[in-house]
Amino acid sequence: MKTLQSTLLLLLLVPLIKPAPPTQQDSRIIYDYGTDNFEESIFSQDYEDKYLDGKNIKEKETVIIPNEKSLQLQKDEAITPLPPKKENDEMPTCLLCVCLSGSVYCEEVDIDAVPPLPKESAYLYARFNKIKKLTAKDFADIPNLRRLDFTGNLIEDIEDGTFSKLSLLEELSLAENQLLKLPVLPPKLTLFNAKYNKIKSRGIKANAFKKLNNLTFLYLDHNALESVPLNLPESLRVIHLQFNNIASITDDTFCKANDTSYIRDRIEEIRLEGNPIVLGKHPNSFICLKRLPIGSYF
């Protein structure tokens, strides 16, 4: 009987039983959601920390790896030899001599040849040395020369064409040397000095001075000339021929025999003293001159 009562009571209570609300499941869901966000937040923060740490490390320990082109350039720069110095770049002349604004002074330094000159040279003073010869090579690359002075050397020979490229040369002094003949002279000379040499008349070509239309001063004194050079240009003002071996002159030496009206008015001085010639025997040789030559008339 008691068993039957218990069974009936159980049947009455079963419909009233409801499942408990899924609080644990909900809280687990909420927890899971929070965990996911937390893990994502942690991951993000961790990534940013690592990125910042990595950036700091890179900034401190950055190693730049050059590309192939820059490596080759550095290699080329390292192995490319310097260009050899040119002879003129070393400027040996300016160590031995004095170079000032286009002028080179090589006086009394015992040189026996023309030294290499700076290309911009305009004036060379090489007086009182031991130079024996002048060559075309000496001035081949110095086109701006205007004055050359070789007074007091031992020059015996001047190579053909030595002055051929010196189109601007105005003054040339070869005084006090050992010359037997004259070289071909550049066309723009205004002054030529070859006194105190051993030049004879056969050492001067017939037209040596003819085309020198700017020649103003001619010094050939103290040589061995037997006659006055022919075809002297009209531009001459001063002619020094003293102390040679000149024994005679003609009516055409300074004047024009067939033109009695001809006046050579530019000549200011002719010196003929110290020669065997007696000027008084040649009166017609000076009728075109404004001043008589200096010399012996008796």
UniProtKB/Swiss-Prot annotation:
GO cellular component: collagen-containing extracellular matrix; extracellular exosome; extracellular matrix; extracellular region; extracellular space; extracellular vesicle; Golgi lumen; lysosomal lumen
Cystine connections: 255-288
GO aspect biological process, one term: bone development
Keyword Amino-acid biosynthesis: no
InterPro entries with a match to the protein in the record: Leu-rich_rpt, Leu-rich_rpt_typical-subtyp, LRR_dom_sf, Mimecan/Epiphycan/Opticin
Gene Ontology MF, one: growth factor activity
Tissue: Bone.
Domain of life: Eukaryota
Keywords from the named record: Disulfide bond, Extracellular matrix, Glycoprotein, Growth factor, Leucine-rich repeat, Proteoglycan, Repeat, Secreted, Signal
Locations listed in the record: Secreted, Extracellular space, Extracellular matrix
PTMs per UniProt: O-glycosylated with a core 1 or possibly core 8 glycan. Contains keratan sulfate.
Gene3D superfamilies assigned to the protein according to its UniProt record, in alphabetical order: Ribonuclease Inhibitor
Pfam families membership: LRR_8
Glycosylation sites: 80, 88, 214, 258
Positions annotated as LRR repeat: 112-131, 132-155, 156-179, 180-199, 200-225, 226-246, 247-277
Signal sequence, renumbered to the chain: 1-20
Biological function: Induces bone formation in conjunction with TGF-beta-1 or TGF-beta-2.
Family per record: Belongs to the small leucine-rich proteoglycan (SLRP) family. SLRP class III subfamily.
Official protein name in the record: Mimecan
